[in-house]
Amino acid sequence: MKKIGIVIFLMLALAVLYSCQEYEMVQYGAGQQINFMGDYYLGQNKEPYWEDDTAYLHYEVNFGINPLGDSLRVDTVLIGVKISGAMVDYPRKVVFKTDAPDENALEVLFPETYYVPADTGQAVFKILLKRPATRNVTYSANLTFDYAQSDFEAGTLERQFFRLKAEDTVNLGLWGSYEEEWDGYYAMYFGDYSETKARYLITKY
């Protein structure tokens, strides 16, 4: 009986050891999965604060409301990624692609080849959004990973897409003004309101 008890104990110990090793492989092994991170302050001209929360995996820009006017052709966006699995001592390639609708597809430019540096589990990359070709229309695209060309596998499902939207729209409300202000002040110098006049004034004030 004593020998049987020892055998059972050893079998249980081996089972526990195997399950622990299997767990560690899942948690820290060679899975090398990639996920998007979101910047809590994205679009607010502040230092990035990266979050895993999916609520921050989006970015919207209005090219119409900017002091550069029509000369602003692209908008720069910082995209953060986080890697699960063990860190490695060599750079690993990340390739993005977009999933966009058939109409009003936002054009996204990738100005460089992207790599996650060695010995790190996070990286930040720069992408460019092109100004929409048509005014007063919302353009959109989902940024995702090209897994076939990247050195990573897909991570958490809900963190595999980063939503992008852009428009080129101007009206009094978006400019931060209102009809009474225009009629009571700007109309004395520029006459009746028009979008063209508002776009000009945005570049001056």
Predicted regions and their residues:
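Positively charged n-region of N-terminal signal peptides that target proteins for export
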Residues: 1-5
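Beta-sandwich strand segments
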Residues: 27-28, 149-162
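Short beta-strand and strand-turn-strand segments in soluble, beta-rich domains
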Residues: 99-115
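Short proline/glycine- and polar residue-rich coil/turn motifs
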Residues: 114-122
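Exposed aromatic-hydrophobic patches
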Residues: 122-130
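Short glycine/proline/serine/threonine-rich loop/turn segments at secondary-structure transition edges
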Residues: 133-140
